[in-house]
């Protein structure tokens, strides 16, 4: 029986990646690094989960002396804090709406008595800001559990953040469905034993989502009865 829907945040609930990219570049300028992550480069970097991890990976690709790389690595936490501040300011200034079909699915889920949860690699501050600007005036859509990347030891594709959500919900994976937009997210959800629906964005449309239980262009294509059927069929075939 379906009891909860667990959503990734960035790219799944809202297409926030361009805003993240702009925030990274603005943070780099504040640190006088003059790096510039183009849309193409950022698409490649999205294969690395987590903002701090993404910056560290990028530093590892630079043609720089070992001492300079070490200096830059030490700056990563501060750069990321600055990026988070800029990102939340950008969200507050220009509302980043949910993707098509998301708000309707959230309302339908609550009307059906289902619980809502978030499992994201982003920071708690980013989650809180995005939900606040999108759910103002709709307290009935409150999420029962929220797990973020800064609360677990290993980020996606490790299942830690999903396992934390399941513990918070006090539910087994067999009664929940996860929603993702990336291969790392899909792997994390499947490793936690969850039936998973994928809705890619332009940032990850070329990734291999063959392991997903359902692959959609938009959450406009799904409703609660279809999700209940998907969960039942997946566990019957297991």
Residue ranges, per PLM feature:
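Residues at secondary-structure transition points
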Residues: 70, 74, 78, 93-100, ...
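Asp-based, Mg2+/Mn2+-dependent phosphohydrolase catalytic module
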Residues: 1-2, 107, 123-125, 129-238
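Small-residue-rich anion-binding loops in enzyme active sites
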Residues: 112, 116-118, 124-125
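N-terminal helical cap/lid subdomain that shapes the substrate entry/recognition surface
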Residues: 1-9, 13-100, 107, 111-112
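Conserved SAM-binding loop
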Residues: 13, 116-119, 178
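Structured helix-beta-strand junction loops
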Residues: 93, 112-113, 149, 211
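Residue-level signature of catalytic and energy-coupling elements of molecular machines
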Residues: 24, 83, 120, 158, ...
């Amino acid at each position: 029986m379906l009891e909860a829907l667990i959503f990734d945040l960035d790219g799944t609930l809202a297409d926030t990646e361009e805003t993240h990219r702009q925030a990274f570049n603005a943070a780099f300028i504040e640190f006088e690094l003059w790096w510039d992550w183009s849309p193409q480069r950022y698409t490649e970097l999205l294969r690395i989960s987590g903002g701090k991890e993404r910056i560290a990976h990028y530093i590892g690709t630079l043609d720089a002396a070992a001492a300079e790389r070490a200096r830059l690595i030490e700056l990563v936490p501060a750069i990321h804090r600055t990026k988070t501040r800029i990102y939340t300011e950008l969200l507050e200034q220009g509302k980043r709406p949910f993707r098509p079909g998301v708000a309707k699915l959230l309302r339908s889920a609550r009307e059906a008595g289902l619980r809502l949860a978030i499992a994201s690699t982003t920071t708690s501050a980013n989650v809180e800001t995005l939900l606040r600007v999108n759910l103002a005036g709709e307290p009935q859509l409150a999420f029962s559990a929220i797990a973020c990347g800064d609360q677990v030891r290993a980020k996606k594709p490790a299942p830690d953040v999903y396992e934390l959500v399941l513990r918070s919900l006090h539910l087994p994976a067999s009664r929940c469905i996860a929603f993702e937009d990336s291969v790392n997210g899909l792997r994390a959800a499947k490793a936690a034993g969850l039936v998973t629906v994928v809705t890619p964005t332009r940032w990850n449309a070329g990734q291999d989502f063959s392991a997903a239980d359902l692959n959609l262009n938009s959450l406009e294509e799904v409703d609660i009865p279809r999700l209940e059927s998907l969960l039942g069929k997946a566990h019957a075939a297991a």
